[in-house]
Regions:
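Residues that define the loop-to-transmembrane-helix transition and helix capping
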Residues: 7, 84, 122-123, 141-142, ...
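Loop-to-helix junctions at membrane interfaces in multi-pass transport proteins
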Residues: 2-5, 26-33, 37-43, 78, ...
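Residue-level recognition of pore/gate-forming positions within transmembrane alpha-helices
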Residues: 17-18, 46-50, 94-95, 129-133, ...
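Membrane-water interface regions at transmembrane-helix termini and the short interhelical loops
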Residues: 30-36, 57-63, 108-116, 130-152, ...
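Hydrophobic core positions of alpha-helical segments in small-molecule transporters
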Residues: 89, 127, 147-150, 249-252
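Membrane-interface "cap" regions at the ends of multi-pass membrane proteins
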Residues: 1-25, 136-139
Length: 272
């Protein structure tokens, strides 16, 4: 693996891999339905846990790989546990499942290109595939790192623009926050949200209710633990320059998830 000389670029690429468009749309829509309990709950696990994991777990992964000198994450796992069978199993799983993921991504990108350019779907998919292939062959993980860094910059700029416009527009409406709270209060008592334990636009669900359990188990435990165990994140930890780089990497890496949470707040505001 190449070593990244820029902690900022590594942090931006790290953060960019944590957030996807589908996650923003999905959780944004959910926030528009049930209110601020979604983004407020996500602040602690997404920002706090990811930062702590990067600062405290990242250096250990880096030091372990410095001794092993593995070229891939799969190789590092096998050498660390001194079990080649693990590497073979992980490689088999990767080779078997990655094509399904690639097909889904290529279909989405192909339809996007077709919609905005008018190019035939087949030509769009072939052209994009050749572009990705050339990038990987030419630069390897360095190309992936730079691509993710650019994606992270775009996400930051786009989020700040959307944030500024949305806040400016809604601030023009007198008492817009009271209107949001009032709209939630107008929901009939027998509505499904009340049955699940939700109590208001800017309040938490009742403790141990179905709504509280849904938010806690999904957003506090399941997703953050899954995020910090993603192989592509471990791979970026392996690419750090030294074990002192991780505070900078973590600081820049949590910016993008933080902005995503702001996006969920904006979704809750604009949807209501």
């Amino acid at each position: 693996l190449p070593t990244s000389d820029s902690n900022i670029s590594l942090g931006l690429s790290y953060g960019a891999t944590l957030i996807s468009t589908s996650a923003i749309i999905g959780f944004g829509g959910l926030a528009g339905w049930i209110g601020f309990s979604i983004p407020l709950t996500m602040i602690i696990p997404f920002v706090g846990l990811i930062y702590i994991a990067t600062v405290y777990i990242g250096p250990k992964v880096w030091k372990a790989n410095k001794k092993i000198k593995a070229k891939t994450y799969i190789e590092m796992i096998g050498k660390h546990y001194n079990t080649p069978m693990i590497s073979k199993l992980l490689a088999l799983i990767t080779v078997g499942l990655i094509p399904f993921y690639c097909v889904a991504v290529l279909i989405g990108v192909g339809k996007f290109i077709t919609t905005f350019t008018g190019i035939e779907f087949v030509h769009a998919v072939i052209g994009f595939s050749l572009l990705v292939f050339g990038t990987i062959v030419y630069g390897g993980m360095s190309s992936v790192l730079k691509n993710d860094m650019i994606q992270g910059i775009i996400v930051i700029l786009g989020s700040l623009i959307v944030l500024s416009i949305t806040v400016f527009v809604h601030m023009q409406v007198p008492g817009f926050w009271d209107n949001l709270v009032g709209a939630w209060a107008a929901v009939p008592e027998g509505d499904g949200l009340y049955k699940l334990g939700f109590t208001g636009f800017d309040t938490w669900p009742e403790f141990w209710s179905r709504g509280w359990l849904m938010i806690t188990t999904l957003l506090v435990f399941t997703i953050p633990v899954g995020l910090i165990t993603l192989p592509q994140l471990q791979t970026r930890w392996m690419m750090a320059k030294d074990d002192k780089s991780f505070k900078t990497i973590a600081s820049w890496g949590v910016i993008i998830p933080g902005l995503a949470i702001v996006t969920f707040m904006l979704a809750a505001i604009s949807a209501n």
